[in-house]
């Protein structure tokens, strides 16, 4: 399933990409409201990192909205950790 955006945003984490040559750039971790999958009883929860990386909208799925949300939070945390390693620890 391809998503154009996270939809209704339920949480935002603001981070800064530190650059020694100038002011830091804002990076946002967005978490969308879980929704039921089309034609299915399971749910998905969209998330996106804006301001660094590829900025694509991703999602995690679960048997209900709670599990989808829980998995999305965990996956988003891992993706931020990987991105920070790629950026050599400049994400704060």
Regions found by a protein language model. Give the residues of each.
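A short, charged, amphipathic alpha-helix used as a generic interaction element across diverse proteins
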Residues: 69-77
């Amino acid at each position: 399933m391809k998503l154009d955006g996270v939809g209704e945003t339920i949480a935002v984490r603001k981070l800064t990409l530190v650059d020694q040559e100038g002011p830091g750039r804002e990076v946002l971790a967005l978490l969308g409201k879980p929704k039921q999958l089309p034609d299915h009883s399971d749910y998905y929860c969209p998330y996106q990192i804006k301001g660094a990386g590829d900025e694509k909208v991703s999602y995690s799925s679960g048997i209900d909205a709670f599990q989808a949300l829980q998995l999305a939070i965990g996956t988003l945390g891992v993706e931020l950790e990987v991105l920070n390693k790629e950026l050599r620890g400049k994400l704060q």
